Every structure is written in C-alpha cells, then in structure tokens.
C-alpha cells in the first residue's frame, strides 16, 4: 500500500509539473525573450544591433573612467595605459593597477576587461548559433553571421593580448558551464581568431568596406584583414601579416592625408581610414570623455594623466629616415651634457594647436 501511495504521489507531481510548463508562456509575444529573439527578420536585426551595446559608455555624465562605478563600455584607459606607447599617471587608487608591477586578480580594471570581452563573446555565440531560425534571405543571413564572427574574433583578440591565453567558448552556455580552463595564446589565435576572420574574408556576402552605407563603421572584409594581420603579427608571421595589411587597401581603405590633430571628428567618420570606427568628438561628455584625461590643463580642464612613453618617443626618427638627436635641435646643442634630472624638466612645444572654443570654456 505504501509503495502504491508513493507511486501516486510521483505521478501527481509529474502531471503538475507538465501542466505548469504547458500553462507557462516561455516565449511571450509582448516582449523579447531568449526563446524568441532570433525568430523573425525584425528581431534578428534588433539582436544584431544589440551586439554593439557592450561597446557604448552610458555613464558620460559621471566623469571619466577612473573609478569602478564610472567604468562602462570600451575601456580606453586600460588599453591606452597598458600599451607600449603610453605612460599613465594618476594618484587615484583605482588607477594604480595600470602602472604598478603587482596586479591583483580581483582588481576592478581586470574584472571589467574580462566581463566586457566575454559579454561580447557570449552575445556573438548566441547570434552565430541561432540566426538560422530567423527566416532571413541568404545574403542577409551570411552578412549577419560574418558580423557576429568578426565581433567574436575581435573580443578574443583583445582577451588574448591582455591574458596570453583564455578559456574558449564558441557556443551558448549557462553561467554554471563557465568552468573551462585556459587555452594557450597560440591556440586562441589559430583555432578561434583566425578561423572566424577567414570565414568573414571568404564570404561573398560580406562587403569590402562599409564607408558608403548608412551603418558606416560596421565590420567589413577590410576590417577583418586588418584584425587578422594583427593576429599574424602576434604569431610573428610578419610577411603573412604584411600581405593582409596590403589587402586592407584593396578593400577601399586608405590613410588619412591631413593633419593628425584634425582627424578625430564626426566629419571624418566616413573617411577611408575608418575601418572599424568608434565615434569621437573633441568636446568631452558626448561621444567620449577620454580627452579629459589625455588633454593637458590648457585644453578644457584635461587631467594630463595619459602621456607619450619616453621609450616610445625615442623610437622616432627624422622624416628622411636618419636618427633623431636632441643635440641637433636649435637651442639644445648641449643636450647630451644635461643630466637625466635636468632633461626631465624640459618640455618642447612645437606648433601647438588648441581648440579656442573649448579652451575658453
């Protein structure tokens, strides 16, 4: 009798669970859920636009990205400060990570970079896996697939530059499944980044460039060649990298012909040099706010925290290719006789150009 009682209870519980599933609307028609995100062309377009959401800094009014509560979107401070060409200075504790030798694994800058890149990875994986359900025509489907795989390659490329090998996920997973161990840096380049970019480059539905489109600045074959060329540089395959960089020009991209300081403005967002563009305006608080940290005190209250690294500056040569020497500059003939301490206080301004409108604010 007791065994029959347990059997009846188990059957009743199963029926109750099944009834709940039948009654529960797991794909509501009045909102976008994971079950219906990729079910129509309209929703697929929204999903593709959503892949770029992670790049945006939504906290412009909270100040620059120097505290964890303000850090949002693409971390330009981190990538600039950790690069060879930049020295970063700040007496603000959250920024110490960027120029201290010892890095804590739980530091918020490291955590943000990890979370930022893997958010793009997992969103791209979702698109790659589910786009076929949206009923798209073949060219649109292939282009969307290329965009998603390009963004995944971009995110893994950035992760690999920072950590030299990371866990690899190429399919949608739950939080509980994020338990894979680190792959080698070479594995990430050869088995993840390069295959994704090859798919983009070989795909006939992926445009050479997006300069003339309404969605200009989106990924293209030219951008894929550029990113793949950088991957080959990390693999020290120099000639292969050079070949890819040559192809960037064949896709319709070119170098900026004007003054460098004039380049970064909304007017030039369709310039041929813009292969995968980030919106920028020199007035802080709109498209960006990194200029508040990069600019000197005479440019709209800049904080003077990001500076050219001295090692990087020493790589410069004269425009004819000969070695640059400070002692050959008029007025600095005795440069070689100065002590390092005396040189440290010397600052040379040559052709200073400032925005009068911003400087007056």
What do these predicted regions represent?
Residues 21-147, 156, 161-162, 166-172, ...:
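Short acidic-aromatic linear motifs embedded in glycine-rich loops, typified by GG[WY][YF]DAGD(H)
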